[in-house]
Amino acid sequence: MEKISEIIRMRLKEAGVRYNSNDNISEYVKEGELEKLQQEVQDQFQTVLDSLVIDTANDHNTQETAKRVAKMYVQEIFGGRFQPTPRVTAFPNMGYKSMYTSGPISIRSTCAHHFQNIVGKCWVGIIPEDEVIGLSKFNRLVHHIAERPQIQEEMTSAIADRLSLFAK
């Protein structure tokens, strides 16, 4: 039986879509597949624990660890890969010409090189032209982009690129 990760990967390749660690692939994950992917990650992480010679059957500290880790990665830490970009509504700018900012916004991400936590704060702002977005949308977009494995320089660029779409 083919793994769900292989099915999704094949779908991405057929579409000619890049699927690097910091890419959002939610458009190519069909309904019900995320649960299957989480189960696959759980099975694979159980193999990692077994390879580390950890007795998950008898050690109360590690029972269901693979399940918890899989859920954490798929739904939380890497949720920005699998969840659609939050909807952002822009409103007509009524003549505001200065930069408006939001911050500090807490960031939690994962280094794609070492799978170590990236924790920090950022401030973002744009100078609006014809439209403005609400301040809460800055936070949503930043969190959505941060929730995937990447190097922090690429995360910064991705946040700037996404916000620049609303500076028009």
Please name every model-derived segment.
Residues 1-168:
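A domain-level signal for the structural core that forms small-molecule/cofactor-binding pockets
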